[in-house]
């Protein structure tokens, strides 16, 4: 893999398309999307359900491969990387936040955040320090010992954000992170994601139909039926 650099874009997509199926049953989920994402940017990918938001995030994060076009992460063409390289990239360079919180119900907030580091073989002392810092970063330093059922929906999503941050990733992908939250809580989560981009120099890419969340991003990419419909 190429050497990482603090200069230049973190992600570049060129004429990326994704087609599922073939022949008469083929469905085009994305069509010729091009974009450049710089370090520390907060980008919102917006559109209605089925517009291609999740498909785009999957391509940009290396979870899926485009049918045509290229995606580069830190200068590396993802199509040329081995699966083991992609796994390593996602483990150390990328954090994921989803609509469903995905927390282990019998583990505390601290233990949930530590879990990826524990699986990766990090020492107890280092993973405890990192998890504590990540929980403090999302405003849950005093709730570290609480289990998910003792936390509100917004607090559970903050735990999932802390879990995404604990490996100190370069990019955080968030797929509909406010979809199960009320308006006030959703706004608070949006502010937290904005703070991540601003204070931790992580790039944040959010797929959302929540216009309030999108308004807090530095830039929007609007998708309509898999095509870039961004105005201006």
Model region roles, listed by residue range:
Residues 1-19, 229-232:
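ABC-family P-loop ATPase nucleotide-binding domain
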Residues 9-224:
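ABC family nucleotide-binding domain
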């Amino acid at each position: 893999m190429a050497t990482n650099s603090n200069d230049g874009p973190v992600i570049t997509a060129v004429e990326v398309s994704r087609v599922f199926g073939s022949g008469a049953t083929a469905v085009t989920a994305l069509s010729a999307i091009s974009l450049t994402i710089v370090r520390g940017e907060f980008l919102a990918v917006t559109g209605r359900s089925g517009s291609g938001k999740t498909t785009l995030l999957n391509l940009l994060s290396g979870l899926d491969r485009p049918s045509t076009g290229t995606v580069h992460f830190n200068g590396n063409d993802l199509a040329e990387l081995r699966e083991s390289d992609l796994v390593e990239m996602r483990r150390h360079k990328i954090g994921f936040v989803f609509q469903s919180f995905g927390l282990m119900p019998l583990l505390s907030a601290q233990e949930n955040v530590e879990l990826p580091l524990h699986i990766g073989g990090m020492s107890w002392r280092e993973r405890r320090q990192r998890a504590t810092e990540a929980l403090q970063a999302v405003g849950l330093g005093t709730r570290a010992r609480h289990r998910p059922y003792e936390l509100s929906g917004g607090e559970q999503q903050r735990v999932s954000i802390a879990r995404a941050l604990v490996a100190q990733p370069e990019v955080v992908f968030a797929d509909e992170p406010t979809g199960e939250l009320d308006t006030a809580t959703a706004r608070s989560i949006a502010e937290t994601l904005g703070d991540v981009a601003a204070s931790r120099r992580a790039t944040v890419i959010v797929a959302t139909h929540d216009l309030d969340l999108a308004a807090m991003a530095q830039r929007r990419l609007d998708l309509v039926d898999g095509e870039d419909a961004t105005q201006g």
